[in-house]
Amino acid sequence: MCIRDRTTDEIKVISVDEVTITTLKKLSPKAIIISPGPGRPSDYPVLSTILSHYDQLIPILGVCLGFQSIVEYYGGRVIHSPKPIHGHTTILRHTNEGIFEGLPQDFNVMRYHSLMVDSGCIPNNLKVTAINDENVIMAVQHQQLSIYGVQYHPESILSEYGHEQLRLFLNEAGVQYAC
C-alpha cells in the first residue's frame, strides 16, 4: 500500500533518528502516523515528545510500536507477549467506531510483534476498540482526542481493510484518501 499514490496531499516520511518538534513544526502536519519499528517505546523518547506536543492538535495514528508508544504515553503498560508473533494473521473484533466505523466484523490483520499491551493496565482515557480471538488488545482510541493505535499492520497486503482504516483516519485530518 502506498499512501502517496492515493492522496494529493504531501506525504513526508521522517526517520525516528531525524525527527524533532522543530522539524515537524516547519512541516505543519495535518496528521501524524507513528510507524512500526524494532524495540520498545522507551527506546525512542522522541515519540513521547511528539505525542506531548501534538496529541491535542492533530489526529495521530500509531502502528505496532506507535500503538505501544501511545498506550505507554497515556499510562498503560507494554509487556512481553507469551509468544512472539511474526508474520501471522489474526481475526479481530471491533467496536465499529473511529477507524473501524462501517467495517465488517471478523476481518484478518497481519501481526509482527513480540510485545503487547497489558490488558489489565489500560488507562481510563483510552478505549479498547479491537481484540483478537485470544483477547489480545489489537486497537485503542483516545476517549476525547483523535488518537488511534493498532497493534497490527494495516499497511500489509494480508491485512484486510487497511486502506479503509487509513481513509477513515486521514479524513479526520481533512486529507482526501482514495481506497
Regions picked out by a protein language model, each given a short descriptive name:
Residues K127-I131, N135-Q141, S146-C179:
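C-terminal and late-domain segments of enzyme folds
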Residues G98-Q144:
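Catalytic beta-strand/loop cores that center a nucleophilic Ser/Cys/Thr
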Residues T90, N108-M110, Y148-V150:
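Residues that recognize and position ribonucleotide moieties
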Residues C64, H113, H153:
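Histidine-centered divalent metal-coordination motifs
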Residues E10-I11, I60, I147:
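Hydrophobic anchor at the start of a short beta-strand
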